[in-house]
Amino acid sequence: MTKVKKEKAGEEETGGTEKSYQELIANINPIANPLASRKLSKKLYKCVKKAAKVKQIRRGVKEVQKFINKGETGIVVFAGDTLPIDVYCHLPIMCEDRSLPYAYVPSKVDLGSSAGSKRPTCVIMIKPHDEYKEAYDECVEEVTSLPKPI
């Protein structure tokens, strides 16, 4: 029994369970639009990681919704593989009403781990900060240039 646990732990350390971008795209839900490209997803994950270090993120549907209603600004990043979609389908509309840039990334597991959490996360808001201003501005520019859903 302990041997099996060691094998699983070894796989996680070497990255044996990582999926490619194409495999992750196959699991996205129908409302995941605009979906970030592989390159933009990587930039967003890095920006989330930098923001988490200085505690400038909002994590989870309830918290993000609360701060959108309060008028806080930032980039909203959604996980495209969240099911059921009823959990967060109202948030993109709230972002559009308040003209906040938002994008979908293919994996909630990757989004959660980039925020420094062991749990998957379906939505994160990245707030602007001076320490990662360059990366943040680059992400805002690319996210706003994505085609908006109709």
UniProtKB/Swiss-Prot annotation:
One of its GO terms (cellular component) is sno(s)RNA-containing ribonucleoprotein complex. SUPFAM superfamilies: L30e-like. GO terms for molecular function: box H/ACA snoRNA binding. One of its GO terms (biological process) is snRNA pseudouridine synthesis. Keywords: Nucleus, Ribonucleoprotein, Ribosome biogenesis, RNA-binding, rRNA processing. Pfam families: Ribosomal_L7Ae. InterPro entries: eL8/uL1-like (IPR050257), H/ACA_rnp_Nhp2-like (IPR002415), Ribosomal_eL30-like_sf (IPR029064), Ribosomal_eL8/eL30/eS12/Gad45 (IPR004038), Ribosomal_eL8/Nhp2 (IPR018492). It is found in: Nucleus, Nucleolus. Transmembrane segments: none annotated. The keyword Disulfide bond does not apply. It comes from the Eukaryota. Belongs to the eukaryotic ribosomal protein eL8 family. Required for ribosome biogenesis. Part of a complex which catalyzes pseudouridylation of rRNA. This involves the isomerization of uridine such that the ribose is subsequently attached to C5, instead of the normal N1. Pseudouridine ('psi') residues may serve to stabilize the conformation of rRNAs. Component of the small nucleolar ribonucleoprotein particle containing H/ACA-type snoRNAs (H/ACA snoRNPs). Component of the telomerase holoenzyme complex. This is H/ACA ribonucleoprotein complex subunit 2-like protein. The lineage of its organism: Eukaryota, Metazoa, Chordata, Craniata, Vertebrata.
